[in-house]
């Protein structure tokens, strides 16, 4: 199992004498340590797969981890006493995101939290609408600020009453009041938001010893990826799951902690040593990704930050190309220059477009690069585009599914009952909402209540009751009938395809219907697959050993629900997009540095390396110095950006940049100086931006004709 590991990686895999922290520098092979350790636990140390959980932050990372573990365990047998020689039941492993694990815990323990197992999971847009309703405003920036404040409170395990008691000013008091009402509204809807998927299990484990003990006994070894990105709530959940046994391995890198703005805290690394005094720390410092020049620049930058743990990356990949820093007159010149040099570099190296990434600090920087790439007919992929599940047509179908599972989900009812149109207008829904509010019931329940006739006519009530009858029939069948049959009947009953062709032009309708069919196909495949065990087996302990070659979950790392539609619906809410379905296109990658974390590219252009952009000012005024904590996080972000590059790294900055209606003078980022690059005169940026004709002439010269 340990073939090909270096000594530090091997120690990380084999150490089982207590809590373990693997400090894994960029490109040092941390995923290999996690996957090899899972295999070591099962094949060599007698652990059953159902007692192991590995958690990470993204569906993509979890999918990669599952795939690697499946390959490692192919053909392997158990070493568990009494089960020696049996094929490893890979499908019983839990390899998932934090939120997927949270959903499984909530499904099992819903009754302890006043929830039904088919609770709804609200997305960001649903939550935005709820906050907007509480604030009674259309001020979107204000709504987002309050929404983010509520999220930070939840992630810090601050209750609404505590937020109210600690409010320092009127704005905080208003936000705390909204928080209190927001939590009550969620409970009335029998719904949770994404933050609740971690917060509620943590609070439950803290309050209920029996539940906590049950989960500690079932998940007997934990592996935590990207530990530096955990927030207070996630750390609390992990600590409660680990319990006194403290059988866990946390893998992370304090130098790559770049999510402070969403509640992640480096304090968790410090706290780990306090809460677990016997913590064993292992450092992975050999980098398998980048050249010596790239690593030297990264080490020089991050050395300016105070250190929790001393470590320094090294590589045996050779010195590599010099790192270049190119000034540009303005944004347009910068984009022209980068795209031209990328094209020339690709030709010289006989590379592919997919070998190149253009990284930037903020999404606002992407537009000009998109324009130039399109003009030059260079294919590109923009990271962070519209999620498959954010498309309106997918949200429409999801609204029906949510309502089938949970009749108390008012936002789902409003969307489903009005799409397609059924002659139920806003006036009718407002009257229904007022009636339901006074009766303190859901909209769905209010449709059937006596007294509604005093508010609405039979002509208004009958379409709503017909719709709710339809949903109830589907819900009754969803518990027992195959998911495929229920989905087909639902789609036939709502006439969604006809609605699309009525509401949109033919091309749009075709695209939207194609997306719906793809989504339904995905659901049906999950609904008809053999049941995988995952966490459900870990909790119940009643599943057989299964077959390592089949049933391995490739979506969320947890239990599928076989042919039952209801269990699939919560899985849908967790998926940010259909991962791994599209082949990696031969295209330049445009991405923020945050979105590039965990990825690598042979050749990287890091653009906009200017004061105010990298490092970003945040909320600071231009005249005020950026505070030390922000600079340290921005420096870690620069470190992440540099270490995405495998073979070459080119930096650019603008001398001037447009801001609103004025042109501002820019200074090169302090991080360029901190890289301590070889002294060399930078390329001149005094010439006018190249015309397309000049570029064509240069390319012809480069091509020898």
Where in this protein do the model-derived segments appear?
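Conserved helicase C-terminal RecA-like lobe
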Residues: 168, 366-378, 391, 398-678
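SF2 helicase catalytic motif II
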Residues: 215-232, 249
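Helicase P-loop NTPase motor core
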Residues: 22, 26-34, 49, 110, ...
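Pre-Walker A adenine-sensing motif
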Residues: 6-14
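Conserved RecA-like helicase ATPase core segment
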Residues: 2, 7, 40-43, 71-72, ...
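A basic/glycine-biased coupling hinge at the interface between accessory DNA-binding modules
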Residues: 17-20, 39-221, 245-246, 266, ...
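Motif I (Walker A/P-loop) of helicase-class P-loop NTPases
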Residues: 31-39, 65-66, 235
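Acidic, low-complexity intrinsically disordered tails
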Residues: 1, 535-556, 679-705
